[in-house]
Amino acid sequence: NGYDSLHQLPGGMRFRFVDAGHILGSASLELWFRDGGRDKKIVFSGDIGKNGNPIIRDPQHITEADYVVIESTYGNRFHKDLEASIEELAKAVKETFKRGGNVLLPSFAVGRTQDVLYILDRLVKEGALKDLDVYVDSPLADRATKIYMAHPEFFDAEAVNSFKFRSSAGMRIHFTTTIEESQKINRIKSGAVIIAGSGMCEGGRIRHHFKHNIWRRECSIIFTGFQVPGTLGRYIVDGAKSAYILGEEMAIRAKVYTIGGFSAHADQGELLEWLGAFTNNPRVFIVHGEEPVALEFEKTVREKLGLTTYVPHPGEELEI
């Protein structure tokens, strides 16, 4: 299935992908090579997923390496509990519908959109929400969801048995790909959950839905992903009263919810758990994190795991 198979490369090198548990198909890489007549092994973590992520399996642990290159996106923080975040999402949707508005949910097309659909379906089945109309207004998310549907072999056991990314009795899912279909959503004044890109509101169809809903007090915007400083999403999260959207200044009257437990990235504890699975004290290179975060994570790794660590500078080359 793409994971766990050993592949040969010229010069005696070999590699294998293992499930990183981040999004569908994400992988860590094991690479074996010869050095001075001896076999050596380097592991590249890739983006490591969070334990208990919806739909996909938890990250697979690796136990041996001479060198490990590990990400540090959230190397200095711990995530909010997922179940508490799911309860917050249900509450936000119910409050919005009670006010007679629409829910706008900016979302990444791959991973987050599918997770949100899965969670909404679960909330409907549990009776926490009912009679939902969900619009996935993103051609890329539509294509990504079709890929998810085609590969249930990568799902965890719970997802395999519970959700098929199709409409059910209590939740109608509408995938809209054409501009005409997208524009029709603008006629809906209440009772819709509109999922659209981009996740940080820098482009995509979410801006068009903002134009028709962001000035309405009865509507809401639910952010489930980190908003980078300088983006429209971050501007809204930080409490802006108005914003230029599609060339027009608009008042931001919709209620803004920021729900923090949906990250697909491992937090500090889960990164340490993944790294702690190595039994032979590899040398660790910490990458893919803002410098203060990477340095703080390096300190934690040294203190808690006793490993030799290094944080490379951007563009730095290292010989191993």
Question: Which stretches of residues belong to each language-model region?
Answer:
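Hard-cation-handling environments
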Residues: 92-229
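Generic long, charged, amphipathic alpha-helical segments
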Residues: 244-274
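C-terminal structured "cap/appendage" subdomains that terminate the fold
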Residues: 271-302
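Short, solvent-exposed amphipathic alpha-helical segments in soluble enzyme
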Residues: 31-34, 59-62, 119-126, 151-153, ...
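Active-site metal-binding loops of divalent metal-dependent hydrolases
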Residues: 23, 46-48, 72-74, 108-110, ...
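His/Asp/Glu-rich metal-coordinating catalytic cores
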Residues: 1-115, 121-128, 133
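Hydrophobic, well-ordered secondary-structure elements that form the walls
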Residues: 206, 284, 309
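Redox- and metal-dependent alpha/beta enzyme cores, enriched for Fe-S-associated oxidoreductases
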Residues: 215-251
